Design a protein with these regions (language model features):
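Gly/Pro-biased beta-strand-loop elements
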Residues: 2-93
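Exported/periplasmic cell-wall-interacting domains
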Residues: 61, 66-146
Length: 146
């Protein structure tokens, strides 16, 4: 019997994985882009995921919902994220994947994941709607050669 694609026990079961500490986004265990989540001392700081408007998006399973929208506050091609029932959101809500501030780059997040539009489009067009947020993505060690 194969492992379900959306298993919560296997990091590799998720098409999309986002690491709070590094801002790395991976698809099927391959690096795709680096963004950020959180503001000021909370930016990419997993220890502050519980602090509203400061910490990064909380760890757990999220569903990427759509269709993408254009908003005045967050710009074009914004993706909404909905937490799975078991994801501890720390009473935080309204998480999105959107673009950075053009006027003040690096300051657009109060917990949302910030990625370039081309990457947001890639995420949506992939058809994969499950995102796993983790504190860090384990480093991949090269296989020993014989």
């Amino acid at each position: 019997m194969s492992t379900p694609k959306n298993s919560t026990t296997d990091l590799n079961a998720f098409a999309w994985t986002y690491a709070q500490q590094s801002g790395e986004l991976e698809q099927d265990d391959r690096p795709v882009a680096t963004g950020y989540s959180g503001a000021n001392e909370g930016k990419n700081n997993p220890e502050l995921e519980n602090v509203r408007n400061v910490g990064p998006i909380p760890c757990g399973r999220w569903t990427i919902t759509g269709p993408p929208v254009d908003t005045h506050d967050h710009g074009p091609f914004v993706l909404r994220l909905e937490p799975a029932s078991e994801t501890q959101t720390h009473a935080r809500a309204g998480f999105l994947i959107h673009g950075d501030s053009k006027a003040n780059p690096g300051t657009a997040s109060q917990g949302c994941i910030i990625l370039p539009r081309s990457i947001r489009e890639q995420v949506w067009e992939s058809g994969d709607r499950e995102l796993l947020v983790v504190p860090t993505i384990p480093s991949k060690k090269a296989e020993p050669s014989e």
